[in-house]
């Protein structure tokens, strides 16, 4: 009986041990399944709960690279770029200042030619014409005088210079040289040409005289009409042999109208028109010359 009881106890202990092992295995499997499920859930939802704070930060933000200390070459290149930008800015600023009109520079320019009486006279005018590359008797000098509203031929006063050059925005020789074509363009406009033509009479005459000396008149007419009026050589010849010593303003202005309106063969000239006697005599002289 005692041996039977011992056998039963042995079998019972074996079963209990087996059950305990099975229980441990069951709990182990449960833990394994739970961990796997949690890992899958975290992967799907992007959870960072299983990460430490530093690991999580590194996953979200890439690690910062350490800044490399600037080498001598880098500093030199940076300085070179800065200097280049400054030189470019400075040259642009200087160029802008040079292009802008300066009354001070214009005044200094005037005194390169003016005498102690604040007037550019014949000697200064000769040097001035040489500097801008224009002969004194060139018609563009007459246009310039007109723009300056100069009152006496061969002279520019300080006031005339400053007022005229300011309107032209010229304060250096180079700027005026670059403006010469613009001045010549006034001669191509009939209205401006007429203004210049009329101005020339008062500009060239002696201020104590109401008329223009015949020799001065022939020179000025040649300057203004010599290249554009085909009959000018004949008219000049007429003046050479005529008795006229002066030309008044009415005669002067009518010569321009005659050159613009009368045909080269004079066929449309009206002897009964309001032309001055000077032109009546020219027409008669020219017709006689043609017939002889």
Curated annotation (Swiss-Prot):
PROSITE patterns: DCUN1. Pfam families: Cullin_binding. InterPro entries: DCN-prot, DCN1-like_PONY, PONY_dom. One of its GO terms (cellular component) is nucleus. It comes from the Eukaryota. One of its GO terms (biological process) is protein neddylation. Keywords: Isopeptide bond, Nucleus, Ubl conjugation. GO terms for molecular function: cullin family protein binding; ubiquitin conjugating enzyme binding; ubiquitin-like protein binding. Residues 45-56 have a biased composition (Polar residues). Residues 43-83 are annotated as: Disordered. Residues 101-287 form the DCUN1 domain. There is a cross-link at residue 95 (Glycyl lysine isopeptide (Lys-Gly) (interchain with G-Cter in SUMO2)). It is found in: Nucleus. The DCUN1 domain, also known as PONY domain, mediates the interaction with different cullins. The DCUN1 domain mediates the interaction with the N-terminally acetylated NEDD8-conjugating E2s enzyme leading to the NEDD8 transfer from N-terminally acetylated NEDD8-conjugating E2s enzyme to different cullin C-terminal domain-RBX complexes; the neddylation efficiency correlates with the DCUN1D5-cullin and DCUN1D5-E2 interaction affinities. Interacts (via the DCUN1 domain) with the unneddylated cullins: interacts with CUL1, CUL2, CUL3, CUL4A, CUL4B and CUL5; these interactions promote the cullin neddylation and the identity of the cullin dictates the affinity of the interaction. Interacts with RBX1 and RNF7. Interacts with CAND1; this interaction is bridged by cullins such as CUL3 and strongly inhibits the neddylation of CUL3. These CAND-cullin-DCNL complexes can only be neddylated in the presence of a substrate adapter. Contributes to the neddylation of all cullins by transferring NEDD8 from N-terminally acetylated NEDD8-conjugating E2s enzyme to different cullin C-terminal domain-RBX complexes which are necessary for the activation of cullin-RING E3 ubiquitin ligases (CRLs). This is DCN1-like protein 4. It comes from Homo sapiens (Human). The lineage of its organism: Eukaryota, Metazoa, Chordata, Craniata, Vertebrata. The gene is DCUN1D4.
């Amino acid at each position: 009986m005692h041996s039977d009881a011992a056998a039963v106890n042995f079998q019972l202990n074996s079963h209990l041990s087996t059950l305990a092992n099975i229980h441990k295995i069951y709990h182990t499997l449960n833990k394994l399944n739970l961990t796997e499920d949690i890992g899958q859930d975290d992967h799907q939802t992007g959870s960072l709960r299983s990460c430490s704070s530093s690991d999580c930060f590194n996953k979200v933000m890439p690690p910062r690279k350490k800044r490399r200390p600037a080498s001598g070459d880098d500093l030199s290149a940076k300085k070179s770029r800065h200097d280049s930008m400054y030189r470019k800015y400075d040259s642009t600023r200087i160029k802008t200042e040079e292009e802008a009109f300066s009354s001070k520079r214009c005044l200094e320019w005037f005194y390169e030619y003016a005498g102690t009486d604040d007037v550019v006279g014949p000697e200064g005018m000769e040097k001035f014409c040489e500097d801008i590359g224009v002969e004194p008797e060139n018609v563009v000098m007459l246009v310039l005088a007109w723009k300056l509203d100069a009152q006496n031929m061969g002279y520019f006063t300080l006031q005339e210079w400053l007022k005229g050059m300011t309107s032209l925005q010229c304060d250096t020789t180079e700027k005026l040289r670059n403006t010469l074509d613009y001045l010549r363009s006034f001669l191509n406009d009939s209205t401006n040409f007429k203004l210049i033509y009329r101005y020339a009479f008062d500009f060239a005459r002696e201020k104590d005289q109401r008329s223009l000396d015949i020799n001065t008149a022939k020179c000025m007419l040649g300057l203004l009409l010599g290249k554009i009026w085909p009959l000018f050589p004949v008219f000049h010849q007429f003046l050479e042999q005529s008795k006229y010593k002066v030309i008044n303003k009415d005669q002067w202005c009518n010569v321009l109208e005659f050159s613009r309106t009368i045909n080269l063969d004079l066929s449309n000239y009206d002897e009964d028109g309001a032309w001055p006697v000077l032109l009546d005599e020219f027409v008669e002289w020219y017709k006689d010359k043609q017939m002889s």
